[in-house]
A protein has these predicted regions:
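A short, acidic, amphipathic alpha-helical segment used as a generic capping/interface helix at domain edges
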Residues: 46-54, 77-82, 101
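Short, basic/aromatic-enriched C-terminal tail that caps enzymatic domains
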Residues: 117-127
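Catalytic cores of alpha/beta
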Residues: 3-11, 79-117
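Short, composition-biased local secondary-structure segments
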Residues: 19-21, 70-81
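Glycine- and other small-residue-rich loops at beta-strand/loop junctions that grip anionic moieties
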Residues: 1, 64, 69, 73, ...
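Generic structural signal for helix capping and beta-alpha/helix-loop junctions
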Residues: 29-30, 70, 101-102, 124-125
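Conserved anion-binding
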Residues: 1-69
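Active-site catalytic pocket residues across diverse enzymes, especially alpha/beta-hydrolases
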Residues: 15, 111, 125
Length: 127
C-alpha cells in the first residue's frame, strides 16, 4: 500500500520504470484504498487511477477484485481488462476468483498476459 503517489514515483525512480507493476485493487469493481483501520472504497474510477500510475511510468498492471478472492465464483475483471487494454499498451495481469482452467482461459482471452492464482491452489482445486 502506498500513502501517496510520490511513493510510487520514488519506487519507479529507484527500480526503473521497466520493473514496477501497479496493483489496481478493487472491491466489486470499485477501487479500494487501504488504511490502517481497513480498506476504504474510493470515489475515483479505476481508469483514473491507472491514468495516474501510467503517467508515473509503471511497467504494467495487476488488476484484482478483492471481492472475488477466495470466492471460487470466477473472475469478474474481464470487461475492465479489455477496457484498459484498449487505452494502454502495457502488460496486464489479473486475479481473483479463479477456479479452474476455464477461468484462466477467460482472463487470458480478455487480454491479460498472465493470471494470479492463489486460493484455488491452496484449496486443491483442479487448475
Amino acid at each position: 500500500s502506498l500513502d501517496a503517489w510520490s511513493d510510487l514515483e520514488k519506487m519507479v525512480g529507484l527500480a526503473g520504470n521497466d520493473r514496477v507493476l501497479f496493483s489496481l485493487d478493487l472491491h466489486q469493481g470499485r477501487p479500494v484504498y487501504h488504511l490502517d483501520n481497513g480498506p476504504r472504497l474510493e470515489r475515483i474510477s479505476p481508469e483514473e487511477l491507472v491514468d495516474r500510475a501510467v503517467s508515473i511510468g509503471v511497467a504494467g498492471l495487476l488488476v484484482i477484485d478483492l471481492a472475488d478472492v477466495g470466492s471460487a465464483a470466477g473472475p469478474s475483471t474481464g470487461p475492465l481488462i479489455q477496457q484498459l487494454l484498449v487505452k494502454y499498451r502495457l502488460p496486464l495481469y489479473a486475479g481473483g476468483g479463479v477456479r479452474d482452467r476455464r477461468d484462466v482461459q477467460a482472463v487470458l482471452d480478455a487480454g491479460a498476459r498472465g493470471v494470479l492464482i492463489g486460493t484455488a491452489v491452496h484449496k486443491g482445486f483442479q487448475i
